[in-house]
Swiss-Prot record:
Topology term for the membrane: Single-pass membrane protein
Protein known as: ATP synthase protein 8
Residue ranges that the Swiss-Prot or TrEMBL entry lists as coiled coil: none
Keyword terms: ATP synthesis, CF(0), Hydrogen ion transport, Ion transport, Membrane, Mitochondrion, Transmembrane, Transmembrane helix, Transport
Gene: ATP8
The keyword Acyltransferase is annotated on this UniProt entry: no
Organism annotation: Podospora anserina (strain S / ATCC MYA-4624 / DSM 980 / FGSC 10383)
Length: 50
């Protein structure tokens, strides 16, 4: 019965927050700046050509 094991839910919540924090860190550090640089280069090229 899950009611008898309160540490199971604490464990799930802890690991969920850790995985979410790692995912947000990886997204903000590595993946999102590539999209920002791509968007900036596209707008710069379109301003040069237009």
């Amino acid at each position: 019965m899950p009611q008898l094991v309160p540490f199971y839910f604490v464990n799930e919540i802890t690991f969920t927050f850790i995985i979410l924090a790692i995912t947000v860190y990886i997204l903000s550090k590595y993946i999102l700046p590539r999209f920002v640089r791509l968007f900036l280069s596209r707008t710069f090229i379109s301003k040069l050509l237009g």
